[in-house]
Structure formats: structure tokens, C-alpha cells
A protein has these predicted regions:
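Conserved N-terminal segment of class I S-adenosyl-L-methionine
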Residues: 1-80, 96-100, 105, 124-172
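Short hydrophobic-acidic sequence motifs that mark active-site Asp/Glu residues
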Residues: 62, 83, 111
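A short His-aromatic
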Residues: 89-90
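Short acidic/histidine- and often glycine-rich active-site loop of Leloir-type glycosyltransferases
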Residues: 120-122
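Conserved beta-strand signature within the Rossmann-like core of class I S-adenosyl-L-methionine
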Residues: 106-117
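A short beta-strand submotif of the Rossmann-like class I SAM-dependent methyltransferase core
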Residues: 80-86
Length: 172
């Protein structure tokens, strides 16, 4: 299981707000495009796509279990999986399942952006929208466990988020 029915319902409610997740992120999409070119990736999965704004800039398959029009699970693998501002929203007891799922979709590379601070948004049940608020060191340990044969470059690009660039060394 990747998400509980209760949490999926809370997130569907949050995503119905036209302002939630609608921010354009051209600078981020440029960085993803550069990493795709550097790693010679042709296909891209936007995992946890929200409103799927990445598709306006990059040829991405959009998947998000909390947005009905993007909830169809993709078939097969992609050269790269981008998962931006998603992992901190995952239910802690299901994080392993989600990371295994991401790894299963990624043939060559991953581009992850993970917030390390509480969200401004609150779920309808009163919890902060970021269910996992952990520092870079914690994420580095978790990601290294789930991507053991990958070259991971983890940077703390600003005080509130980390960026992870992962390249598969061919062993999966």
C-alpha cells in the first residue's frame, strides 16, 4: 500500500483547492531538464504530480494517487523519476513502500526535492501537511538504504529543502 484511504481522502480535499499546488516552478523544471540531458534520459515520470504543472515544461507522465485525473498508475519504467515536494507528505509507515515504488519506476535516474520543515498548510484533521519533517542526515540514511547501488548526490540547497540527484549504476 502506498497511501491509506483516509489520508488519500484528506489529500484529495486539499488538492481541490485551486490555489494548492498551483505554483509554477520554472527554475526547478529547468534543473530537471538539465539533469535529464546530463543523464541522457528521454522518458520522465512526475511522481506525485499534484496539478501536473511540470507537463507544461517537460514531456512527463503525471501520476498522483490523490488527484483523480492523474491516479492511474503508470505501466513500465521511465528513464527518470522526478518526485518534488512529495516525500515529506507520505505517511511515515508507508515511506518504504513509496521509495520502493519510485525505485521500481526509475531505470536511470531520480530527481527528488524534499522539504525539511513544517508546511504552511494543515490537513482537515489538524495535522501539518508535512508528515515527515526530518533533517538532511536522516534522509541521506533512508535514501541510501533504498537506493543502495545508486550514486546519490544530496545537497541542502537552502535551509528548508534538500535536493537528491540519483544515478543508477546498472545493478538496480
Amino acid at each position: 500500500m502506498l497511501i491509506s484511504k483516509e489520508y488519500q481522502s484528506l489529500n484529495e480535499h486539499l488538492h481541490k483547492n485551486p490555489k494548492y499546488g498551483s505554483r509554477r516552478r520554472e527554475a526547478l523544471y529547468d534543473k530537471i531538464a538539465d539533469f535529464m540531458a546530463e543523464t541522457e534520459c528521454k522518458t520522465l515520470l512526475d511522481y506525485g504530480c499534484g496539478k501536473a504543472s511540470m507537463r507544461e515544461y517537460l514531456p512527463a507522465y503525471s501520476y498522483d494517487p490523490c488527484v483523480p485525473e492523474f491516479s492511474v498508475r503508470p505501466e513500465g519504467a521511465f528513464d527518470m523519476v522526478a518526485c518534488c515536494d512529495v516525500l515529506e507528505h507520505v505517511e511515515p509507515d508507508l515511506l518504504t513502500n513509496v521509495l520502493v515504488d519510485i525505485r521500481g519506476y526509475a531505470d536511470k535516474a531520480v530527481y527528488l526535492v524534499i522539504s525539511t520543515r513544517p508546511a504552511a498548510k494543515v490537513l482537515a484533521d489538524g495535522r501539518n501537511a508535512h508528515l515527515i519533517v526530518k533533517p538532511l542526515d536522516w534522509w541521506q540514511e533512508v535514501l541510501t538504504q533504498h537506493f543502495p547501488f545508486w550514486q546519490l548526490t544530496i545537497t541542502n540547497s537552502d535551509i528548508s529543502a534538500i535536493t537528491v540527484l540519483g544515478i543508477n549504476d546498472g545493478r538496480r
